Amino acid sequence: MVAEAGSMPAASSVKKPFGLRSKMGKWCRHCFPWCRGSGKSNVGTSGDHDDSAMKTLRSKMGKWCRHCFPWCRGSSKSNVGTSGDHDDSAMKTLRSKMGKWCCHCFPCCRGSGKSKVGPWGDYDDSAFMEPRYHVRREDLDKLHRAAWWGKVPRKDLIVMLKDTDMNKKDKQKRTALHLASANGNSEVVKLLLDRRCQLNILDNKKRTALTKAVQCREDECALMLLEHGTDPNIPDEYGNTALHYAIYNEDKLMAKALLLYGADIESKNKHGLTPLLLGVHEQKQQVVKFLIKKKANLNALDRYGRTALILAVCCGSASIVSLLLEQNIDVSSQDLSGQTAREYAVSSHHNVICQLLSDYKEKQMLKVSSENSNPEQDLKLTSEEESQRLKGSENSQPEEMSQEPEINKGGDRKVEEEMKKHGSTHMGFPENLPNGATADNGDDGLIPPRKSRTPESQQFPDTENEQYHSDEQNDTQKQLSEEQNTGILQDEILIHEEKQIEVAENEF
């Protein structure tokens, strides 16, 4: 399929490679079983075709790659061995011309990263293909055979472990623990763990025994390895951890166990896929829901800047899109090409997903408008206005308080005038006068004015002040007259006593 530069076609809009067909004629039914040629070919309808291009490609490649051409195993005249190794220079040349492989013709090979085609679908799934080891008996020694097939009695296996190194590797860098874990021989795994073998040795794909056990769905062996302290976060050559393989296998129990033993839920592989993004890309709805409950990052980005929502839209999974929208995910985020999830949905003609995104956007708009017209905010505004009014009234009160001393001064002047009329300013007051007024205070014995702290609206009228001061003056005058009377009585008593003394002296 030849795509335009910078475009990102959806999975449902993949077209057949007519450009290559026109050169090769009709496709070989064995190599490309779903692609039967173009109607525009100059080849007849009988099925005959010019296969010179196919022969040339075969002669260069030798044996077909089983991942790219699973039904066509090459020519018996090839000088390539039976291991399946081949010269892939022609395949690389073909990739450079075609860009992205047609998913019908090449179901397992997704093209080259150097292609001019956009990043959609440019993921190599070969890491998840054929999880089990390819084992040949002649390549294994006694210990590795016993670990793989597990048919050796326990006593013989113990003797075997004493005589040989339990961490010995074969040609593919696999230990006995790798082989036993991948094939589910839990008794051998337990015996090796009891003998304290090394846990984190890597094979030729940089995978630990735990990674192989999870990849091959051998949960019992994987749990035993986790209990003995195997590191669950060691990535293989593709960047995948054990959790990535558990998510790919939709093994929720294994994923839960890995998280319980410290697996990183945000670890990324070489494509920038976290376990959540991998689950979305592979349309594993149940494990996606599981990871969302485990608080996986919904805004994580792959190497092309795509979120989980964009991946779900590109895959055409309406159920996962609906699941992500329930989490209030950001629908306006763009990838490195500047496209949003809605733009992908429109270009791929995913009408159901377009409707889901439109409904979600309308709900968000209504929510924002309701928040803007919130009555609580109106109450806050009214309370702020009232507080401003109160502040204004408080600012006016000091002016009223400043007028009080003038009023008090007027009342003091009236008191002084009344005192002058009665001549009280020239009298000496005793020390026990009310309000503590004395002649020594420098006020000529006058009563000091009382300062009122009440506002102007609460002060007494002028008539009441005059009555108060006149009553106070009458009391002082009464007190003075009483003191004068007592002085007269004391003088009379003294005079009477002097007369008695004189009478007594005359008698003597």
Curated annotation (Swiss-Prot):
Q: What's in the keyword line of the UniProt record? A: ANK repeat, Repeat
Annotated segments matching region Disordered: 367-488
Domain of life of the native organism: Eukaryota
The ANK repeats lie at 172-201, 205-234, 238-267, 271-300, 304-333
Bias kind Polar residues: ranges? 367-376, 476-488
Which spans does this entry mark as compositional bias, Basic and acidic residues? 377-392, 406-421
The entry sums up its family as follows: Belongs to the POTE family.
Protein name (record)? POTE ankyrin domain family member G
Q: Which gene encodes it?
A: POTEG
